[in-house]
Amino acid sequence: MKVALVVNPFATRVSEEGLADVRAELNRVAQLDVLLTEHPGHAAELVAGACRAGADAVVVFSGDGGFNEALNGLEGDVPIGFLPGGGTSVLPRALGIPHDPVAAASQVAVTTL
């Protein structure tokens, strides 16, 4: 399974170590293409490109705003998962997604991929 992992490296709780842990968790079940956002709106562009390139799923590691951007780029029926990397992470709390991004990655691996 080919999965685009869209990462906002500027999000409050996204770090190199955290990204490495998330990658290790998702690599157990998928072939990852890690895409780093570089500017506002870039997540939507990256997700749209990944969908067009044949990604089987998209996973977003960012804050709530970055996830919203990513949703705007989603095309077709490609499933999407969210790993919380923001400071407040209101959306994950509302949806029952684990606050810890590695635990969330484990959940995504089981339920989405």
Whereabouts are the PLM-identified features?
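ATP/NTP phosphate-donor binding region
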Residues: 1-58, 68, 102-105
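Catalytic core of DAGKc-family lipid kinases
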Residues: 6, 37, 52, 73-113
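Glycine-rich Rossmann-fold phosphate-binding loop(s) that bind the pyrophosphate
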Residues: 62-63, 85
